[in-house]
Protein backbone atom coordinates (compact mmCIF):
# COMPACT_ATOMS: atom_id res chain seq x y z
CA UNK A 1 0.00 0.00 0.00
CA UNK A 2 1.13 3.55 -0.73
CA UNK A 3 0.53 4.67 2.83
CA UNK A 4 2.91 2.02 4.10
CA UNK A 5 5.68 3.31 1.85
CA UNK A 6 5.75 6.73 3.47
CA UNK A 7 8.43 7.04 6.08
CA UNK A 8 9.77 10.59 6.17
CA UNK A 9 11.92 11.33 9.25
CA UNK A 10 10.88 14.35 11.27
CA UNK A 11 14.40 15.79 10.99
CA UNK A 12 14.20 15.81 7.18
CA UNK A 13 11.30 18.09 6.36
CA UNK A 14 10.63 17.48 2.67
CA UNK A 15 9.39 20.00 0.14
CA UNK A 16 5.96 18.37 0.30
CA UNK A 17 5.71 18.90 4.05
CA UNK A 18 6.90 22.47 3.70
CA UNK A 19 4.22 23.14 1.11
CA UNK A 20 1.64 21.42 3.32
CA UNK A 21 2.43 23.99 6.01
CA UNK A 22 2.81 27.07 3.82
CA UNK A 23 -0.28 26.49 1.66
CA UNK A 24 -2.83 26.43 4.53
CA UNK A 25 -1.21 29.51 6.08
CA UNK A 26 -1.61 31.33 2.76
CA UNK A 27 -5.18 30.02 2.53
CA UNK A 28 -6.03 31.38 5.98
CA UNK A 29 -4.44 34.71 5.09
CA UNK A 30 -6.54 34.90 1.91
CA UNK A 31 -9.67 33.98 3.87
CA UNK A 32 -8.88 36.77 6.34
CA UNK A 33 -8.34 39.25 3.51
CA UNK A 34 -11.64 38.32 1.82
CA UNK A 35 -13.50 38.51 5.13
CA UNK A 36 -12.01 41.92 5.88
CA UNK A 37 -12.88 43.29 2.44
CA UNK A 38 -16.50 42.15 2.83
CA UNK A 39 -16.96 43.33 6.41
CA UNK A 40 -15.56 46.78 5.55
CA UNK A 41 -18.57 47.48 3.31
CA UNK A 42 -21.07 49.62 5.21
CA UNK A 43 -24.56 49.86 3.65
CA UNK A 44 -26.03 53.32 4.11
CA UNK A 45 -29.60 52.06 4.08
CA UNK A 46 -30.79 51.52 7.66
CA UNK A 47 -33.33 48.80 6.84
CA UNK A 48 -30.69 46.63 5.18
CA UNK A 49 -28.40 46.83 8.20
CA UNK A 50 -31.17 46.14 10.73
CA UNK A 51 -32.47 43.04 8.95
CA UNK A 52 -28.96 41.75 8.29
CA UNK A 53 -27.97 42.11 11.96
CA UNK A 54 -31.08 40.19 13.04
CA UNK A 55 -30.05 37.34 10.75
CA UNK A 56 -26.44 37.53 11.96
CA UNK A 57 -27.40 37.46 15.64
CA UNK A 58 -29.86 34.64 15.02
CA UNK A 59 -27.20 32.65 13.18
CA UNK A 60 -24.69 33.14 15.99
CA UNK A 61 -27.21 32.12 18.66
CA UNK A 62 -28.27 29.05 16.69
CA UNK A 63 -24.69 27.92 16.04
CA UNK A 64 -23.63 28.40 19.66
CA UNK A 65 -26.65 26.38 20.80
CA UNK A 66 -25.71 23.67 18.34
CA UNK A 67 -22.15 23.56 19.62
CA UNK A 68 -23.38 23.21 23.20
CA UNK A 69 -25.50 20.25 22.09
CA UNK A 70 -22.63 18.66 20.16
CA UNK A 71 -20.13 19.04 23.03
CA UNK A 72 -21.33 16.12 25.21
CA UNK A 73 -21.76 13.93 22.12
CA UNK A 74 -18.25 14.75 20.97
CA UNK A 75 -16.84 14.09 24.44
CA UNK A 76 -18.56 10.69 24.59
CA UNK A 77 -17.27 9.75 21.13
CA UNK A 78 -13.75 10.83 22.09
CA UNK A 79 -13.85 8.46 25.05
CA UNK A 80 -15.32 5.71 22.86
CA UNK A 81 -12.50 6.11 20.32
CA UNK A 82 -9.92 5.97 23.10
CA UNK A 83 -11.42 2.74 24.43
CA UNK A 84 -11.74 1.18 20.96
CA UNK A 85 -8.13 1.93 20.04
CA UNK A 86 -6.89 0.69 23.39
CA UNK A 87 -8.77 -2.59 22.97
CA UNK A 88 -7.60 -3.07 19.36
CA UNK A 89 -3.97 -1.97 19.65
CA UNK A 90 -3.34 -2.58 23.37
CA UNK A 91 -1.50 0.75 23.53
CA UNK A 92 -2.29 3.77 25.65
CA UNK A 93 -0.22 5.93 23.30
CA UNK A 94 -2.21 4.86 20.24
CA UNK A 95 -5.48 5.37 22.08
CA UNK A 96 -4.48 8.81 23.30
CA UNK A 97 -3.26 9.99 19.90
CA UNK A 98 -6.41 8.71 18.17
CA UNK A 99 -8.61 10.53 20.69
CA UNK A 100 -6.54 13.68 20.19
CA UNK A 101 -6.97 13.40 16.42
CA UNK A 102 -10.74 13.14 16.77
CA UNK A 103 -10.92 16.12 19.12
CA UNK A 104 -8.72 18.33 16.94
CA UNK A 105 -10.71 17.42 13.83
CA UNK A 106 -13.93 18.44 15.56
CA UNK A 107 -12.45 21.66 16.95
CA UNK A 108 -10.98 22.64 13.58
CA UNK A 109 -14.31 22.05 11.84
CA UNK A 110 -16.16 24.03 14.52
CA UNK A 111 -13.79 26.99 14.18
CA UNK A 112 -14.15 27.00 10.39
CA UNK A 113 -17.93 26.78 10.74
CA UNK A 114 -18.04 29.79 13.05
CA UNK A 115 -15.80 31.88 10.79
CA UNK A 116 -17.89 31.03 7.74
CA UNK A 117 -21.15 31.75 9.57
CA UNK A 118 -19.87 35.08 10.92
CA UNK A 119 -18.98 36.42 7.48
CA UNK A 120 -21.77 34.96 5.35
CA UNK A 121 -24.60 36.07 7.65
CA UNK A 122 -23.27 39.62 7.44
CA UNK A 123 -22.70 39.57 3.69
CA UNK A 124 -26.30 39.56 2.44
CA UNK A 125 -26.97 43.25 3.04
CA UNK A 126 -23.51 44.17 1.78
CA UNK A 127 -24.11 42.20 -1.43
CA UNK A 128 -27.48 43.92 -1.93
CA UNK A 129 -25.88 47.30 -1.32
CA UNK A 130 -23.06 46.65 -3.80
CA UNK A 131 -25.69 45.51 -6.30
CA UNK A 132 -26.55 49.17 -6.87
CA UNK A 133 -23.38 49.33 -8.96
CA UNK A 134 -24.21 46.29 -11.07
CA UNK A 135 -23.89 42.51 -11.04
CA UNK A 136 -20.09 42.54 -10.93
CA UNK A 137 -19.62 44.19 -7.51
CA UNK A 138 -22.49 42.16 -6.02
CA UNK A 139 -21.07 38.88 -7.32
CA UNK A 140 -17.58 39.79 -6.12
CA UNK A 141 -18.89 40.53 -2.61
CA UNK A 142 -20.91 37.33 -2.31
CA UNK A 143 -18.09 35.25 -3.81
CA UNK A 144 -15.52 36.62 -1.36
CA UNK A 145 -17.89 35.94 1.54
CA UNK A 146 -18.42 32.37 0.36
CA UNK A 147 -14.70 31.68 0.02
CA UNK A 148 -14.10 32.39 3.71
CA UNK A 149 -15.75 29.13 4.77
CA UNK A 150 -14.15 27.02 2.05
CA UNK A 151 -10.64 28.39 2.47
CA UNK A 152 -10.83 28.26 6.27
CA UNK A 153 -12.07 24.68 6.38
CA UNK A 154 -9.56 23.32 3.86
CA UNK A 155 -6.65 25.27 5.34
CA UNK A 156 -7.36 24.36 8.95
CA UNK A 157 -7.84 20.69 8.02
CA UNK A 158 -4.59 20.53 6.04
CA UNK A 159 -2.66 22.31 8.78
CA UNK A 160 -3.96 19.97 11.50
CA UNK A 161 -3.25 16.85 9.45
CA UNK A 162 0.26 18.02 8.54
CA UNK A 163 1.21 18.89 12.12
CA UNK A 164 -0.21 15.63 13.47
CA UNK A 165 1.54 13.63 10.75
CA UNK A 166 4.88 15.18 11.62
CA UNK A 167 4.32 14.49 15.32
CA UNK A 168 2.86 10.98 15.02
CA UNK A 169 5.39 9.72 12.47
CA UNK A 170 8.17 10.58 14.89
CA UNK A 171 6.81 8.37 17.69
CA UNK A 172 4.95 5.59 15.83
CA UNK A 173 6.03 3.16 13.08
CA UNK A 174 4.73 3.70 9.57
CA UNK A 175 1.49 1.66 9.60
CA UNK A 176 0.40 2.89 13.03
CA UNK A 177 0.68 6.66 12.64
CA UNK A 178 -1.89 6.50 9.84
CA UNK A 179 -4.27 4.55 12.10
CA UNK A 180 -3.88 7.18 14.82
CA UNK A 181 -4.43 10.01 12.33
CA UNK A 182 -7.63 8.64 10.76
CA UNK A 183 -10.07 9.91 13.47
CA UNK A 184 -9.38 13.51 12.35
CA UNK A 185 -11.88 12.93 9.53
CA UNK A 186 -14.47 11.51 11.94
CA UNK A 187 -14.23 14.55 14.20
CA UNK A 188 -14.59 17.00 11.32
CA UNK A 189 -17.54 15.04 9.91
CA UNK A 190 -19.32 15.09 13.28
CA UNK A 191 -19.50 18.89 13.30
CA UNK A 192 -20.41 19.28 9.62
CA UNK A 193 -23.15 16.64 9.91
CA UNK A 194 -24.75 18.32 12.91
CA UNK A 195 -24.63 21.77 11.31
CA UNK A 196 -25.97 20.57 7.97
CA UNK A 197 -28.82 18.43 9.27
CA UNK A 198 -29.89 20.68 12.15
CA UNK A 199 -29.72 23.80 9.99
CA UNK A 200 -31.83 22.16 7.30
CA UNK A 201 -34.47 21.05 9.80
CA UNK A 202 -34.53 24.50 11.41
CA UNK A 203 -34.96 26.41 8.15
CA UNK A 204 -37.65 24.03 6.90
CA UNK A 205 -39.58 24.37 10.16
CA UNK A 206 -39.38 28.16 9.91
CA UNK A 207 -40.34 28.05 6.23
CA UNK A 208 -43.48 26.01 6.79
CA UNK A 209 -44.31 27.23 10.29
CA UNK A 210 -44.22 30.95 9.69
CA UNK A 211 -43.09 32.02 6.24
CA UNK A 212 -45.65 29.99 4.26
CA UNK A 213 -48.37 30.59 6.86
CA UNK A 214 -47.80 34.34 6.64
CA UNK A 215 -48.10 34.13 2.88
CA UNK A 216 -51.31 32.09 2.90
CA UNK A 217 -53.15 33.52 5.92
CA UNK A 218 -51.93 37.11 6.15
CA UNK A 219 -51.20 37.78 2.51
CA UNK A 220 -47.57 38.67 3.24
CA UNK A 221 -45.35 37.74 0.28
CA UNK A 222 -42.93 34.88 0.82
CA UNK A 223 -39.46 36.01 2.00
CA UNK A 224 -40.87 39.41 2.99
CA UNK A 225 -38.83 40.83 5.93
CA UNK A 226 -42.03 42.01 7.64
CA UNK A 227 -42.63 38.37 8.58
CA UNK A 228 -40.38 37.31 11.50
CA UNK A 229 -40.41 33.79 10.10
CA UNK A 230 -38.30 35.00 7.19
CA UNK A 231 -35.53 35.95 9.64
CA UNK A 232 -35.64 32.45 11.15
CA UNK A 233 -35.67 30.94 7.66
CA UNK A 234 -32.51 32.81 6.73
CA UNK A 235 -30.85 31.86 10.02
CA UNK A 236 -31.32 28.18 9.18
CA UNK A 237 -30.15 28.69 5.61
Language-model regions: role of each:
Residues 1-7:
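Short, Lys/Arg-rich, polar N-terminal cytosolic tail immediately upstream
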Residues 10-236:
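Hydrophobic, small-residue-rich transmembrane alpha-helices and their short perimembrane loops
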Amino acid sequence: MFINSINTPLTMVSLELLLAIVVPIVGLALAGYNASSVLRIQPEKKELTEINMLIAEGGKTFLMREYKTILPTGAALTILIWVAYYVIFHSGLMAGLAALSFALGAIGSAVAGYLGMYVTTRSAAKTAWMGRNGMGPALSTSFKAGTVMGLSLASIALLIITILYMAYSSVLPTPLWAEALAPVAFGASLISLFIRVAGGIYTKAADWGADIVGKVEAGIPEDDPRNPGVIADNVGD
